[in-house]
Amino acid sequence: EKRGLCYTIFAQTGAYEDTGLTTIYAGTSGDELAELTGITIDEMKRAADDMTPEEVARARAQMKAGLLMGLESSSARAERMARMVQIWGKVPPIEETVARIDNVTTGDVRVFAEDIAASAPAALALYGPVGKAPGLEALQARRAA
């Protein structure tokens, strides 16, 4: 954003019983693609290295607030229950879920983030004028560096 390389960028995750998915989406021009992908990888690695206990505490608070506020909606409760059955094969009590969130440490998150940033399997999907885009191999090398 600071460099004006993209008009939108966001990340999202999906968790399942035996796998997970982290997606980073960025909308940019073909001319900015190579620089944007490199900076995105560097930022993922930096975020893992620079993570503070305060950031993890804020993330825990946000997760718990979203979870507890979601209990006010019957559709959100039903979606949560279905997701829990899909992932865990049961619906754990809300207190158990909150306790699990509270037990996550900065070290836990840092180790996970470092793995995602440096070595988790990756895929690359591009559309539009992408002739100047680096290949997946080049991006993997930058992640591993």
Regions found by a protein language model. Name each.
Residues 46, 64-145:
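C-terminal regions of mature proteins
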